[in-house]
Design a protein with these regions (language model features):
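RecB-family 4Fe-4S metal-dependent nuclease core
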Residues: 1-246
């Protein structure tokens, strides 16, 4: 889904939206990307990651997201054809934290305002029904994009004060409400001033120091008590049988 939006947006901002709509079959592009992903992750179909029915459902949900986004009135709520200048897609970040320990990631989308010169980092997030207020206030979710802001500013040598950040949340499922239309795509803009960045950096640094020593080796002098929760099913240690999740 993200690759499809990135390619479509690239064409919109580099050429024109009318040409992107005319020359790019976004649904066919999405279908092909999902097919490639399914084959790769399923070991050429030997170990399917989902059923055929589920794959079709995911694809149809993606079509609805694309239909919504490509309508000009919706598109204009997120991007400006006149003001947004495309800077980067999948911008790599590889910053040294400690010896043999680097922060690595890819920023989905970066634009710069032609009027003000401000940068905007966009992170696309696909969600079943959108983010709740608890998810929007989750420090771990927000810290990711705040660290992107810090490290990208350092990478290109600019002040983080001229970088804005946002999550664009793509909802696979939208409840039907008679009185009003619930948007299929929404935006979450977390606080990203200096105090927020410092707090995110402090939390991340403490995590790194609790896991690695000064040489970048895993610490063996620390015990990490398990914290059972409904998220245990997603944990690698649970899947590998290293933890019972209880």
């Amino acid at each position: 889904m993200h690759e499809t939006l990135q390619e479509y947006l690239s064409r919109c901002l580099r050429i024109s939206k009318s040409q992107a709509d005319k020359n790019m079959d976004t649904k066919e592009f999405l279908k092909e990307k999902m097919r490639e992903f399914f084959i790769k992750e399923s070991n050429d179909g030997a170990n399917p990651i989902c059923s055929k029915e589920e794959l079709v459902e995911f694809l149809e949900d993606g079509y609805l997201i694309l239909d919504y986004f490509q309508k000009s009135k919706n598109f204009n709520n997120f991007f400006s054809l006149k003001d947004d200048e495309l800077v980067a897609i999948e911008q790599p970040i590889n910053t040294k934290i400690l010896e043999n320990v680097n922060f690595m990631g890819f920023i989905d989308f970066i634009v710069r305002s032609k009027k003000t010169g401000r940068y905007r980092i966009t992170d696309f997030k696909t969600s079943t029904k959108g983010w709740s207020k608890y998810q929007k206030s989750d420090p771990i979710k927000n810290s990711q994009i705040l660290l992107y802001k810090k490290f990208y500013a350092e990478l290109i040598g600019i002040s983080p004060d001229i970088i804005d950040v946002e999550f664009i949340i793509l909802k696979r499922k939208v409840a039907e409400v008679e009185d009003f239309t619930i948007p299929r795509i929404s935006k979450h803009v977390p606080a990203s001033g200096k105090p927020s960045i410092n707090k995110a950096w402090k939390g991340f640094s403490e995590f790194v120091e609790s896991v690695f020593d000064s040489e970048g080796k895993y610490r063996t002098d620390v015990e990490y008590p398990k914290k059972p929760s409904k998220l245990c099913g997603w944990c690698e240690f649970f899947e590998r049988g290293l933890c019972d999740g209880k």
